[in-house]
UniProtKB/Swiss-Prot annotation:
Location within or outside the cell: Cytoplasm
Keyword Signal: no
Positions with a binding annotation for Mg(2+): 491, 497
A GO term, aspect molecular function: polyribonucleotide nucleotidyltransferase activity
UniProt EC number: 2.7.7.8
Protein name: Polyribonucleotide nucleotidyltransferase
Assigned keywords, A-Z: Cytoplasm, Magnesium, Metal-binding, Nucleotidyltransferase, RNA-binding, Transferase
Family: Belongs to the polyribonucleotide nucleotidyltransferase family.
SUPFAM superfamilies with a match to the protein in the record: Eukaryotic type KH-domain (KH-domain type I) (SSF54791), Nucleic acid-binding proteins (SSF50249), Ribonuclease PH domain 2-like (SSF55666), Ribosomal protein S5 domain 2-like (SSF54211)
GO cellular component labels: cytosol
Function: Involved in mRNA degradation. Catalyzes the phosphorolysis of single-stranded polyribonucleotides processively in the 3'- to 5'-direction.
Source organism: Brevibacillus brevis (strain 47 / JCM 6285 / NBRC 100599)
């Protein structure tokens, strides 16, 4: 039966939130039009009828930006939206992370979530509207989802928390925290902060959760009225006989292999046991083996997972032998690469990141063409994860969602310590190459990038370090273990990946992903404190490598010279169709960027070229003063007079009658092109034309000479 049109209202942070059902996308299994202020999002969810023969849950979350939502037409020749923007990818991840843990384990049906941005009110976050819409659409559909969930943004202004701050409020806030969760627990955190203490970050998270509870109750009320009966699904389960047989054959040996401390040796031993076990069962029953292979692989994986978790929770022993709060051995060095502007390598156990800092002119900023107000980005951090970092051979592809997400996390962590444009007028790009990986690569890239900034001579406000925390819950969920500096196996087999970056003074970024339904305040508080202790340990190590930014930039970095001109003179520097500024660039080899307020930035590796360009610009904007005498150059000779250049870009006419004291028959009799002559500015007319006189200068010179020759009365 077709769903009837229903609307439900909720006041969220002083603005109206409306969920409209039965109006759009009625053939989807669940859909809702979310209106938050003037923001409008269509959230639609669908599910396949049959499960897929996969060993993972095939969930896809899409966040589709449409430029018509902000009244823009896409640029380029095609004039339509292309691949998702970086912001759209991050929004998809933001929605995916709190939703994914709330599907039943063993659910293998395809689930697709599509959020289409139809209209954007900059003061009402479309990401938050899409997150709420996703949850509501799933909850009213027949898809088995253990929600609802909700999310909010938390800011802090003058010590007070603000829910879903407006653009104006966000500019004053020292926290930008997105938190999501269920009525009982928090299951996703994404934060940027300006060196905020852990205790305040915790309170901000809990303040957000208080509003989330209300939004969840609001959705529960909707579900009670219009929710569909959930579909019956076949959850993937392992045949108990296969489980018992595989455990009897391989469990003891796998448990021994898990205790091998060195990563590659441990993985090799586990892989050998798995391969030998599969060969055993293939030989034992060749006919049935093809159907049993996936289950056998799953049981082998479960044995490893169960043993790793048991060792941590019961024996407090980690796969590599570390204590629960112990950080792997650290090493770092700077100036790895001679010709780059700044470089550093940071190693933590078997995780290694090489970061390179490049400084550019302000014209090198990234131009953004999206749904937000931000038009350009002066600081960038990019993250690359090549296959050789984990000893694999696979095709190289453009950065995926993971790489973009890790790059953005590093960018958020480091941005609060980047000097202002006034203090350091450069565009800054950091690139982190993960050259060896055993977990926590995003945090290693943050550490390496900060070292590279200091190596490049960027006057950062304070060094930042990052660390990844893990969580292992007991089967009864009555006890838990928090791990410091998790490695790959602990990340893969654990319940939480909790990344925290910051300075000695406080937090600059947080990212939390979990695989269970949620965590409480106690776990958050302990994880934040344990991360703080670990972060300070890493910062001490980093400071022993380089204690402060270098005093001088690399000789290969551009030197930037700043000057200020009258904004009304900008057009004189640029010239018609940019001819003047392009000529300066061509002659000197510099880069020139001009701001609307009259600030001019000149960049070049060659300091002398900067000075030359600056002199030309100063000449272009110099004001011609009536009564002033200039030494000019004759540029053009006409019957009626000579055009004389006073300085770059400024010419005046010396009429033939003003060339000499006596009458002049021909201009050429007095001056020729290229001659240097002294002239006086006699007039600037209403059209800005400059009239000059050589005659006036000659008269003044003659009068001065006569005065010098005439004896005084005293003589």
């Amino acid at each position: 039966m077709e769903q009837q049109y229903r609307t439900y209202d909720f006041e969220l942070a002083g603005r109206k939130l409306t969920l409209e059902f039965g109006k759009m996308a009625k053939q989807a299994h669940g859909s809702v039009l979310v209106r938050y202020g003037d923001t409008a999002i269509l959230s639609a969810v669908t599910v396949s009828k049959e499960p897929k023969p996969l060993d993972f849950f095939p969930l896809t979350v899409n966040y589709e930006e449409r430029l018509y939502a902000v009244g823009k037409i896409p640029g380029g020749f095609i004039k339509r939206e292309g691949r998702p923007s970086e912001k759209a990818i991050l929004a998809s991840r933001l929605i995916d992370r709190p939703v994914r843990p709330l599907f039943a384990e063993g659910f293998r049906n395809d689930v697709q979530i599509v959020n289409t941005v139809l209209s954007v009110d900059q003061d009402c976050s479309p990401e938050i509207a899409a997150m709420i819409g996703t949850s509501a659409a799933l909850c009213v559909s027949e898809i088995p989802f253990e929600g609802p969930i909700a999310g909010v943004i938390v800011g802090r202004i003058d010590g007070e928390f603000v829910i879903n701050p407006t653009v104006a409020q966000a500019e004053k806030s020292d926290i930008h925290l997105t938190v999501a969760g269920t009525h009982k627990a928090i299951n996703m955190v994404e934060a940027a902060a300006n060196q905020v203490p852990e205790a305040i970050m915790l309170e901000a998270i809990m303040a957000g959760h208080d509003v989330i509870k209300q939004l969840v109750e609001f959705q529960n009320m909707i579900v009670s009225e219009i929710g569909k009966q959930k579909m019956e699904v076949i959850l993937h389960e392992v045949d108990p006989e296969i489980d018992q047989a595989v455990r009897a054959y391989a469990e003891a040996r796998l448990k021994e292999a898990v205790r091998i401390e060195e990563k590659q040796a441990r993985y090799d031993a586990i892989d050998d046991i798995k391969a030998e076990t599969k060969e055993h069962f293939a030989a034992k029953d060749a006919e049935a083996y093809p159907e049993q292979e996936k289950m056998i692989s799953e049981v082998l994986g479960n044995i490893v997972k169960d043993e790793v978790r048991r060792l941590i929770t019961d024996e407090k022993v980690r796969p590599d032998g570390r204590a629960l709060n112990e950080i792997r051995p650290l090493s770092s060095e700077t100036t790895i690469l001679s010709r780059t502007h700044g470089s550093a390598m940071f190693t933590r156990g078997q995780t290694q990141a090489l970061s390179v800092c490049t400084l550019g002119a302000l014209g090198d900023v990234q131009i953004l063409d999206g749904l937000g107000l931000e038009e350009s980005k002066r600081f960038m951090h990019h993250y690359n994860f090549p296959p050789y970092s984990v000893g694999e051979a696979r095709p190289l592809r453009p950065p995926g969602r993971r790489e973009i997400g890790h790059g953005a996390l590093g960018e958020r962590a480091i941005e609060p310590i980047i000097p202002s444009e006034v203090e350091f007028p450069y565009t800054i790009r950091l690139v982190s190459e993960v050259i060896e990986s055993n977990g926590s690569t995003s945090q290693a890239s943050i550490c390496a990038s900060v070292l590279a900034l200091m190596d490049a001579g960027v006057p950062i406000k304070a060094p930042v370090a990052g660390i990844a925390m893990g969580l292992i819950m007991s089967k009864d969920e009555k006890s838990f273990s928090i791990l410091t500096d998790i490695q790959g196996m602990e990340d893969h087999l654990g319940d939480m990946d909790f990344k925290v970056a910051g300075t000695e003074a406080g937090v600059t970024a947080i990212q939390m992903d979990i695989k269970i339904s949620g965590i409480n305040r106690e776990i958050l508080e302990l994880a934040l404190e344990q991360a703080r202790v670990g972060r300070l340990h890493i910062l001490n190590h980093m400071m022993s490598t380089i204690s402060e930014p270098r005093k001088e930039l690399s000789p290969y970095a551009p030197k930037i010279m700043t000057m200020t001109i009258n904004p009304e003179k900008i057009r004189d520097v640029i010239g018609p169709q940019g001819r003047v500024i392009n000529k300066i660039i061509e002659e000197t080899g510099v880069k020139i960027d001009i701001e609307q307020d009259g600030r001019v930035f000149i960049a070049s590796i060659n300091h002398e070229a900067n000075l030359r360009a600056k002199q030309i610009i100063e000449d272009l904007v110099r004001e011609v003063a009536v009564g002033q005498v200039y030494l000019g150059t004759v540029k053009r000779v006409e019957k009626y007079g000579a055009f004389i250049e006073l300085f770059a870009g400024k010419e005046g006419l010396c009429h033939i009658s003003q060339l000499a004291e006596e009458r002049v028959a021909k201009t050429e009799d007095v001056v020729a092109v290229g001659d240097k002559v002294q002239v006086k500015v006699t007039e600037i007319d209403d059209q800005g034309r400059v009239n000059l006189s050589r005659k006036a200068v000659l008269k003044e010179q003659a009068a001065a000479e006569q005065a010098a020759e005439t004896p005084t009365k005293a003589e």
